[in-house]
Amino acid sequence: MRLFLSLSLLATVTAQASPQIICDTTVPVGDGKITIELWPKSAPHGVTRLSSLVKDGFFTDLPFFRAIPNFLIQFGISPDAAMQNKWNSAGNIEDDPHSTVPFTDGIVSYAGYGPNSRSTHLFLTLGNQPGLGKSPWEVPVGKVVKGLDVMKGIYTGYGDKVDQGRLNPQRKDAKAYLAGFLRLDRFKGCKLIEGQEHQVEL
């Protein structure tokens, strides 16, 4: 008689969950919340800046001032003059390494105008956008992992009509100008959930 002995060897390792940003919005879809998973390993500079903005309350009442159907939704101008001044003074951040991650539905990236020009302006992609990702500032820093229906419900009727320059909170007429776009959606506020360590069996 042969005796067969089966041994199962289990090992555990500690893994780090990706940090997330949970945002409340004015969008009248579902609970109005959007959850963004951040990718600090591939975009360390961008994620560090974005995390700092969230923790500082920059996203409070932050309008989606540029929302183009089937393309993108841009944000990043605070209606609070002191807040915007603080982050303007912080300067731009260094570009992250080029990424081959495609710009699919719900990707989060910075807007920019040249090398090392990223500051507070970001955008969300609406649908697949193969034309994005070629500029040095267009590096995905995360992706919407919950609330895609909310993201797609952001009002896009104004398209590119909002003049970004007139949203500068230093202008005396900035609030009055913004009030003229009654249907413009916005973030009510966001909170950062740091990645938690957990055990994974191998």
What does each model-found stretch correspond to?
Residues V13-L202:
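Cyclophilin-like peptidyl-prolyl cis-trans isomerases
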